[in-house]
């Protein structure tokens, strides 16, 4: 496609090229269903190690702009991060029993959160779950999470009333999910859409949707997480605008989710 576009551009007059160039080089993006992409809020290529925020956070969820993560191997519950093969590489500590996490602080409301990821083919070394996740937080805790593993993906809401006694954080509502057949070492694109009280999560052509009042709260950060070992690149965040086709898309997604349960 790129070679074809280049040959076509060489044959065009400069004046015509000026008007057609935006269309010839238009970026191909994964489809959205709940929303339409609006203003771009953040673009993080993640090909070099991001600078760490100097802000003092309010817990883990808010009070900072930019990135928070650890680069120290076996540093505890947050795991460790570096750049490997041109991507942001997260490693769960074998003794931590907790995903590696990296948070990007920015204020947002309705949004499209998109990131490429790869589950790396490394030994488990006692770690249990090969997975990645994308979470959205409000001022104090998680609002929603998109979990992805080799055999399935699910979308989770968090309770506004119940607290998990083990971690003192909001308890999870029952997840909604679909089976997947992902491969180690392959790159995929995860898309999490949030608008009002609804959310849609999509990977490898399969989507899930759910709703919860907490989704409508102002958001303060995006968290990336890794079970075992995974890499990320090209984190993009846009405003999530209303999609007039959402009722039709919702019906199709719910039907596919129902069919997947059979």
Q: Residue locations for each model-derived region?
A:
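Short tryptophan-centered beta-strand motifs in secreted/extracellular beta-sheet-rich domains
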Residues: 113-115, 185-195, 199-203
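Ligand-recognition surfaces built from glycine- and aromatic
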Residues: 29-38, 217-262
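Secretory/extracellular carbohydrate-interaction modules
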Residues: 90-164
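Beta-strand-rich interaction surfaces with strong enrichment in secreted/lumenal proteins
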Residues: 99-106, 176-182, 211-212, 221-222
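Short, aromatic/His-centered strand-loop micro-motif at the edge of beta-sheets
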Residues: 165-189
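Short, solvent-exposed beta-strand-to-loop segments that form ligand-recognition rims
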Residues: 202-223
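Extracellular glycan-recognition surfaces and repeat-rich motifs
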Residues: 56-88, 94-97, 253
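Extracellular beta-strand elements of beta-rich domains used
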Residues: 46, 192, 235-237
């Amino acid at each position: 496609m790129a070679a074809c576009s280049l040959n076509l551009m060489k044959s065009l007059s400069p004046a015509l090229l000026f008007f057609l160039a935006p269309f010839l080089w238009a970026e191909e993006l994964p489809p959205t269903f709940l929303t339409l992409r609006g203003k771009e809020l953040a673009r993080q290529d993640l090909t070099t190690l991001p600078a760490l925020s100097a802000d003092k956070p309010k817990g883990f969820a808010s009070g900072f702009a930019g990135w928070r993560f650890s680069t120290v191997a076996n540093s505890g519950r947050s795991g460790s991060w570096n750049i490997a093969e041109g991507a942001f590489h997260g490693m769960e500590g074998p003794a931590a029993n907790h995903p590696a996490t990296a948070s990007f602080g920015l204020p947002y409301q309705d949004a499209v959160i998109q990131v490429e990821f790869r589950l790396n083919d490394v030994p488990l070394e006692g770690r249990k779950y090969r997975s990645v996740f994308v979470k959205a937080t409000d001022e104090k805790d998680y609002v929603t999470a998109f979990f992805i593993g080799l055999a399935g993906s699910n979308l989770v809401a968090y309770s506004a009333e119940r607290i998990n006694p083990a971690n003192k954080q909001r308890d999870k509502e029952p997840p909604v999910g679909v089976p997947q057949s992902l491969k180690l070492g392959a790159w995929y694109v995860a898309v999490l859409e949030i608008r009002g009280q609804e959310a849609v999560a999509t990977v490898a052509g399969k989507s899930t949707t759910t709703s919860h009042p907490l989704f409508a709260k102002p958001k303060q950060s995006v968290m990336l997480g890794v079970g075992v070992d995974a890499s990320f690149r090209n984190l993009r965040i846009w405003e999530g605008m209303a999609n007039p086709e959402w009722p039709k898309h919702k019906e199709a997604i719910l039907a596919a989710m129902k069919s997947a349960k059979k």
